[in-house]
From Swiss-Prot:
Catalytic residues of the enzyme: 90, 93, 116
Source organism per UniProt: Populus trichocarpa (Western balsam poplar)
Function of the protein: Catalyzes the reaction of cyanate with bicarbonate to produce ammonia and carbon dioxide.
Protein name as catalogued: Cyanate hydratase
Gene this protein is translated from: CYN
Enzyme Commission no: 4.2.1.104
Length: 162
């Protein structure tokens, strides 16, 4: 399966490369976030059939077989060696370094819970800092999910005495 996924990703990346467009440009044309476009092209997200026409318009060379493949649920996986890529390593390092503080603020602002990575939006933007130098802005926008008290009376899967 992994060889097939790699082949599909390589073909999708070739379509993008041949278009001459960036993920941000494709995102602008499709109404998606730039990270979601990249996720689609790396088979880490499923293409919604309603979005397929705008993606096809943004990438006219996208063949029908790849478009159909993109609408199937993907195998969301990654190469464990990916962490060795410096940009990915630094992103992981930033999350790990700031993670406890972010968790503390989430708990203070929302209560005991987490940020969903399912009902989730992510984007990467380029801005100028106060010093005039380029800065990277990574936005994680996830639904808040509170932890629940596990009362047996609310557990519908548990058999009830009649």
């Amino acid at each position: 399966m992994e060889d097939n996924k790699t082949t599909i990703i390589n073909r999708l990346e070739a379509v993008k490369r041949n278009s001459g467009k960036s993920c941000s440009q494709i995102a602008e044309q499709t109404g998606l976030t730039n990270v979601y476009v990249a996720q689609l092209l790396r088979r880490q997200a499923q293409l919604n059939p309603d979005t397929a026409p705008s993606l096809r318009a943004a990438l006219p060379e996208l063949p029908e077989d790849l478009l159909q493949e993109m609408m199937r649920p993907p195998m969301r996986s990654y190469d464990p060696n990916l962490i060795q890529e410096p940009c990915v390593y630094r992103l992981n390092e930033a999350v790990m370094h700031f993670g406890e503080s972010i968790k503390e603020i989430i708990n203070e602002e929302f209560g005991d819970g987490i940020m969903s990575a399912i009902d989730f939006y992510c984007s990467v933007d380029k801005v100028k800092g106060v010093d005039g130098k380029d800065r990277v802005v990574v936005t994680f926008d996830g639904k808040y999910l509170p932890y629940t008290e596990q009362k047996s009376e609310h557990m519908v899967s548990r058999p009830r005495p009649h």
